[in-house]
Amino acid sequence: MKEILNTILKNLIQARFTFVLLFYCLSVFVAIQFLKNTELFSNETLTYFGAPVAFDIYNFQYWGIISNSFVHYEYGNFILNAIGLLLLGSYVERRIGIKNFFLFGLIASTISSAFQLAFSDDAGIGLSGVNYALFGYIFTKTFIDIRFRIVTKNIALVVMLLFIPFCEYMNRFGGWNVATISLISGFTVGGLVAFLYSQYSKIIKLSLFLLLLFSGISLVYTPWSAQWNCANGIYWHEKSDTERAKSYYLNAIYFDETSLCGNDNLKIIKIDELSAKAFTAHNRGDYLKARYFYEEILKIDIENSWAKNNLKRLP
C-alpha cells in the first residue's frame, strides 16, 4: 500500500499538463454551477463553454467533439472524472511526456466523442471517454512495458468493464445519461495506442487511421442519425427546398419517432402548403375550399391566428 501511495505521489509531483487540464475543467464546472439556476443558462450557454448539442455539431461546430471533454454538469460526474484524470493522467504523463500525452488526449477525445455522437445522437460531455482511453492504455502497457506494471490491474479491469453495463442499465431505468459508447471506444483507442510501437505497429497505425477517418466522415455523413437528418433538413428548409427538407425530416422521424425537430418542422411545411392553397382559394372566391384548408391548418395548429381570422372573414 505504501508503495502504491508513493507512486501516486511521484506521478502527481511530476505531472504538469494534467493539472492544467484539471484546473480548466474545474473553472468551467464552477462557472456552469454558478449560471445553471439563472435565466442566462441554456444550451447556448453550454456551447459557449465548449459543449454544443448534436444539431450544432452537425452544423459545422465540429470542435465540439474535443472541447466537450472539458465540460461537466453534475457533481458526481465531475468528481469521478477529476479523480480519474488525476490518477490516470498523471500516471501516463510522467511516463510518456507532455507532448505525447497531449496528442493521446486529442486522439482519444476526438474518437470517443465522434463515436458517441454517431451512434447515440449525443456527443456527451466530460472526460469519461478520455479517462477510459487512459485506463485502456495503462492496462495494455502492463503486459509490454515494465514502467506500467501495476499489481491491481486485473481488479481495476473488472471494475472498469462492469461499470459500462451498469451505466447502460442506469441510463435505461435510472434516468442516468452516461456516454457508454464513449467509454467503450475510449478504452479501445487506449489499448490500440499502447501497441503503437510494437511489432504490430503497421496494423495499429492503420486501425487508428480508420477510426479517425470514420470520426471525420461521421461529422458530415451519418444518414442513420436523427440529428444529422434534422440538421440537413433545416439547411434545405432555409434554402426553400421544402421537398428535400421534408425527406430529411421524415428520415429523422424514422430513426427517432419522438424527434421534435422532425415532427415540428414537418408541421411547419404542411401548414405553409395549406396556407398557400387557402390563400389562393380565398382570393379566387372558392370559399368552400378555403374553409377546408383553414380548418386543416387549425387541426395541426389550433392557435393559428392567421387561419382563425380568415375563417371569420369568410361569407
What are these language model-derived features?
Residues 232, 258-259, 304:
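Residue-level recognition of tetratricopeptide repeat
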Residues 2-234:
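A detector for small-residue-rich transmembrane helices and their helix-helix packing motifs
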Residues 223-237, 268-282, 309:
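Alpha-helical tetratricopeptide repeat
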